[in-house]
């Protein structure tokens, strides 16, 4: 199985499913109660209480990840991005790149709405600025087309260049 990071894992719903499919899952969330629930529902995965701003340090990654210490896939679901403090948004996106192995992918999904003001266009621009490729964008987990300016949900498939 792949080495997968569940960024903003909450109570471990996504990580549990990925672990059940045979992947090596590490979940990170800022809320210790949610991490305790994740440990309860999926004790064989690794669950860490931490802020995504501190992601590389918490995972023991200095500089950019290598094939030995990085993740092949990062999943960030559940509106995590929409609730980040404005000052931490781009650093968190950069951390996503830093923890991916060369050629690794990130799948990030979140919605717009009250209290969630990280504009999709800004998120995609931030991803490009920190060195991630934007490979695909969708307006749902069912892969409906993303329409800039009218979609209320974004699922972005990003990748760290292989070299």
Task: List each language-model region with its residue ranges.
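Conserved class I S-adenosyl-L-methionine
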Residues: 2-10
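A short SAM/SAH-binding and catalytic strip from SAM-dependent methyltransferases
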Residues: 72-87
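Conserved beta-strand signature within the Rossmann-like core of class I S-adenosyl-L-methionine
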Residues: 103-110
């Amino acid at each position: 199985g792949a080495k997968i990071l569940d960024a903003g894992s909450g109570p471990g719903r996504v990580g549990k499913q990925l672990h059940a499919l045979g992947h090596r899952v590490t979940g990170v969330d800022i809320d210790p109660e949610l991490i305790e629930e994740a440990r309860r529902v999926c004790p064989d995965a690794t669950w860490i209480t931490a802020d995504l701003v501190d992601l590389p340090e918490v995972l023991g990654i200095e500089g950019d990840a290598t094939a030995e210490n990085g993740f092949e896939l990062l999943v960030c679901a559940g509106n995590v991005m929409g609730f980040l403090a404005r000052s931490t948004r781009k650093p968190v996106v950069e951390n996503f790149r830093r923890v991916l192995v060369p050629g690794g992918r990130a799948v990030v999904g979140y919605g717009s709405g009250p209290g969630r003001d990280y504009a999709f266009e800004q998120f995609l621009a931030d991803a490009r600025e920190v060195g991630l490729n934007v490979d695909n964008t969708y307006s749902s987990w069912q892969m409906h087309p993303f329409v800039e300016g009218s979609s209320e949900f974004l699922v972005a498939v990003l990748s760290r260049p292989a070299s």
